[in-house]
Amino acid sequence: LKTYSLDWDIDDPIFNFNLLGFNSYISKDYDFVFYLNKNCNFNFKRVNDQQIIENGITYVFSIFRFFLEKTEQKIELISNFSYPQIIINDNNSFFDKIEKVKILIPEYNYFNYFLKSDSLLDDEFYINLENLKKICKFNKINIDKIKIKNLENLILPT
């Protein structure tokens, strides 16, 4: 199996996007998407998951996508936490199964979800977010503070 490596620069156009982090009381991705769709007039749909392989373990992150016609931009909602993976130990320990979860962007591990967009959303969206009771916190994220290898996790298949 051949492995290829890409060298990125933070100024690469592929990293030209806005990122908003959400900390929510809603832990299930589909419930959170339903909540955003209902309260923010979005129409997110589930698309292929983001898969990251690390040390032979495949971690899966949910992705939802929506095309906002008004501004002609693609908006993606990405889970910051993978689905739990059950790892079976073969070293005869007392605990032979371990549940592992990977964080997509460890620099912002306090956010459950990320909203990735081509450009800034309108002010009405942010005002609406402030009134949503099930969102504890949301912040625009400076992607310059994210390590390149973690930024690569946000390059999603189209």
Go through the PLM ranges and name each one.
Residues S5-I14, E99-Y110:
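Short, flexible, solvent-exposed loop/turn segments with mixed acidic/basic and small polar residues
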Residues D9-S27:
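Terminal, regulation- and interaction-focused segments at domain boundaries
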Residues L20-F22, F64, L115:
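Well-ordered beta-strand positions enriched in small/hydrophobic/aromatic, beta-favoring residues
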Residues F22-I57, F66:
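Aromatic- and glycine-enriched beta-alpha-beta binding-site module
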Residues I26-V33, K70-K74, L121-I127:
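Short, surface-exposed beta-strand/loop "edge" segments at domain boundaries and coil↔beta transitions
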Residues Q51-I98:
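Surface-exposed, low-hydrophobicity interaction/linker segments
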Residues Y110-T158:
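Glycine-rich, aromatic-bearing surface loops/beta-hairpins
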